[in-house]
Regions:
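Short acidic/glycine-rich loops and adjacent helix/strand connectors
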Residues: 1-138
Length: 138
């Protein structure tokens, strides 16, 4: 199973997991040479998948942070369907790209920050506070 993680906000980035293992993580500014570059990344995703020897047809799921969809331009113009219930829940969407419809989950922005902190800590239990400069736009 191949999973793409995509963030099109400031410091746009993406990662590729194959069979549960991280095989690539990329930031747009490393390609564009523009500090904190943002927006559309799919052209670069295509190139990096090709360099990793993965066809886009192998992608089973796309995950992204939902905060960018609230009143901002996330650069993910290929999102076909957006459903919002509560801002603290995962949002189920569909992405249409290269003629395929792929399941996509938008995970709350601060939950992404908290999960990274927790999983990088090697602790069984922890308390995590997240706070960033831009807010969540809702």
């Amino acid at each position: 199973m191949v999973v793409l993680g995509i963030c099109g906000g400031h410091d746009a980035n993406w990662c590729v997991f194959k069979d549960g293992k991280l095989i690539g993580a990329f930031e747009k500014e490393r390609f564009s040479r523009i500090r904190h570059d943002e927006g559309y990344v799919m052209d670069l995703v295509d190139k990096t998948l090709e360099n990793l020897g993965i066809s886009f047809d192998e992608v089973s799921l796309i995950a992204t942070s939902e905060a960018n969809f609230k009143g901002t331009d996330p650069g993910l113009h290929y999102i076909k369907k957006r459903i919002y219930d509560e801002p603290d829940q995962w949002v189920d969407m569909q992405v249409e790209y290269h003629g395929r419809i792929i399941p996509c989950f938008a995970i709350p922005h601060h939950l992404c920050h908290a999960a990274y902190s927790y999983y990088a800590s090697n602790e069984d239990e922890s308390v995590v506070l997240t706070w960033d400069g831009g807010g969540d736009f809702y």
